Amino acid sequence: MDYVLSLLGPLAQGATVTLKLFVITLLLAVPLGLVLALARVSRWKALSAFVNGYIWLMRGTPLMLQMLFIHFALPFVPVIGVRLPDFPAAVVAFALNYAAYFAEIFRAGIQSIDRGQYEGAKVLGMSYGQTMRRIVLPQMVRRILPPMSNETITLVKDTSLIYVLALNDLLRAARGIVQRDFTTTPFIVAAAFYLVMTLVLTWGFQRLEKRYAKHDE
């Protein structure tokens, strides 16, 4: 028991890095995903096609590969030539990748709204922006909560990929202790950390779903 307690400090430090990446990614990817979704359903076919290509690229290639490209290959790209530090490179990769996934969730939510509501809003004199803001998006939020919950939980687990950039996240901290002490106990404790984080997220999304369900009654 004393050994397990001694692991909490180092693993908590790693969990801090994990949570930091998780929060920053959400703050960037959710609004970017919404913008991409609105562009995806836009009447401008060129814009819609461009966004569709972006989503295809980000969803069709591994997140780890994107992260390695941004960190190691970006400096050699003409015009850009910027080398990002480890953590910012991870943030950029995660935000761009998850924005594509969130965009598809938002797009499905937007397109699930009955077309008659758009026509009704038009009769009332609402602009496209007002229709989206007052009618479509509020209903969309309620419908996308389950897939958003799944994707957000996946994000927590995907943060472990940043070990390839030598960032001392939760998994890397556990791995270092395992190699030092020749025991798998740190992995079990790290798993408990991940389970607690996903449990909190699951509880939060369930509360949101219940709250919206009450409004529908």
Language-model features: where?
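Transmembrane alpha-helices and adjacent helix-loop boundaries
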Residues: 1-217
